[in-house]
């Protein structure tokens, strides 16, 4: 009898454990505004909800919420996300005509559709991580300077973009400059498209710590990227400034666009001085220089020496590292290693090896060429009385050059060697 009871108890415990496991398995909850019910259904695979807020309330961490129809969200607020979720838009569009997208307090992935909103599409905070997948499109339409596409704040919060983010306000993607709002990371990956359509808007505004990583994609704004603080790494991608050319002017609550693709603004902001590393990427400005580095708000010493690679629409010699030089290639300026340079045109005097020379041009650039000499050897006729010149020949540098000089005398023809000194 005891053995039977023990067996039954074990089975009951096993069933209970299985029930817990099944309850915690991720499920997909659907959102379709056309469904009708009095009470929202309990969480279950393929349960369908009228609103995305109801689906989020029912969901558990790890679940997926799938749109199965276009969705309009009423009101002027944001939808809170406080559990780790994936929202699959199913190639549909979620429209928030008067409000914003999501207040993000836990990890969230947006994929496979379109989010149209007036205010910020996502406000990422409290250590949450937002991923915008490659098949996701975000459009934030407000033209207010304090609105934009995605903003991120607080230590550990992170935004990673593979898809498309377009805004018409102050910045398409932005940090917040308050001392307590730093410690964030923004990653722009290959294939991403970040665009600000406002004539005075920024592509990315980075006013605080910790990391802005541009690995690829295309970033466009009146100024493409505006940096005040933090660690900035650009290894790839295309950054475009398409705004009107304007002088730098310090602004304590944002950044004034200059038309440049990249602005470094060292200005005693709470996050400290910016640390910038550009090893690759393409920087282009329609109306201004490709890059500008400035000081404001009583700061001193502009940031220099931060460019070691990349291609630019204007000369960036003032900002390259000591062992680098700018090569002018048509209308492009490429940053390359200085030393042992054997060809090309440069915006400052390059270091060339023996046998090559750098010649300064009328426009201030320098062109590197190989040193060659001309001499006229005698013909193949071995008769010493011939005075016929041969065709001009080049003679490599580094070899002593002797130019035959004929002196005619009664005894015949003699040759005197004259060494050319270079």
Regions flagged by a language model, labelled:
Residues 1-24, 420-422:
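Sec-dependent, cleavable N-terminal signal peptides
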